[in-house]
Each structure stands twice: as structure tokens, then as C-alpha cells.
Amino acid sequence: MNLLQVVRDHWVHVLVPMGFVFGYYLDRKNDEKLTAFRNKSLLYKRELKPNEEVTWK
């Protein structure tokens, strides 16, 4: 019964950080997908000039 009371009182302290970590993971996976597309895109496929930064970070 005591464990059930602790879970009932503190569930938000577990779910909020888990949601943050899950969102961070999904954001990283989406960035990987967009980076893979950038490398195949004709717009960004050209050779960069010397000392030129990438156009899409």
C-alpha cells in the first residue's frame, strides 16, 4: 500500500523527465533523417568554395 501511495504522489516527477528524453530522442532521429536527405538533395550537392560554410546545418 505504501508503494502505491508513493507512485500516486510522484508520478509526474517520473513522466515529465521521461517525456523530455523521449522528445530529445525523436528530435535527434528527425535530424538524422533530414541530414540524409540533404546529402541527396540537388540544391546542396554542389562543391563548396574554399572557406565556405555549409548552407544547411
UniProtKB/Swiss-Prot annotation:
<keyword id="KW-0472">Membrane</keyword>
<dbReference type="GO" id="GO:0005739">
    <property type="term" value="C:mitochondrion"/>
</dbReference>
<dbReference type="InterPro" id="IPR012575">
    <property type="entry name" value="NDUB1"/>
</dbReference>
<keyword id="KW-0999">Mitochondrion inner membrane</keyword>
<dbReference type="GO" id="GO:0005743">
    <property type="term" value="C:mitochondrial inner membrane"/>
</dbReference>
<comment type="function">
    <text>Accessory subunit of the mitochondrial membrane respiratory chain NADH dehydrogenase (Complex I) that is believed not to be involved in catalysis. Complex I functions in the transfer of electrons from NADH to the respiratory chain. The immediate electron acceptor for the enzyme is believed to be ubiquinone.</text>
</comment>
<keyword id="KW-0249">Electron transport</keyword>
<keyword id="KW-1133">Transmembrane helix</keyword>
<feature type="transmembrane region" description="Helical">
    <location>
        <begin position="10"/>
        <end position="26"/>
    </location>
</feature>
<keyword id="KW-0813">Transport</keyword>
<dbReference type="GO" id="GO:0045271">
    <property type="term" value="C:respiratory chain complex I"/>
</dbReference>
<keyword id="KW-0496">Mitochondrion</keyword>
<dbReference type="Pfam" id="PF08040">
    <property type="entry name" value="NADH_oxidored"/>
</dbReference>
<comment type="subunit">
    <text>Complex I is composed of 45 different subunits.</text>
</comment>
<keyword id="KW-0812">Transmembrane</keyword>
<comment type="similarity">
    <text>Belongs to the complex I NDUFB1 subunit family.</text>
</comment>
<protein>
    <recommendedName>
        <fullName>NADH dehydrogenase [ubiquinone] 1 beta subcomplex subunit 1</fullName>
    </recommendedName>
</protein>
<keyword id="KW-0679">Respiratory chain</keyword>
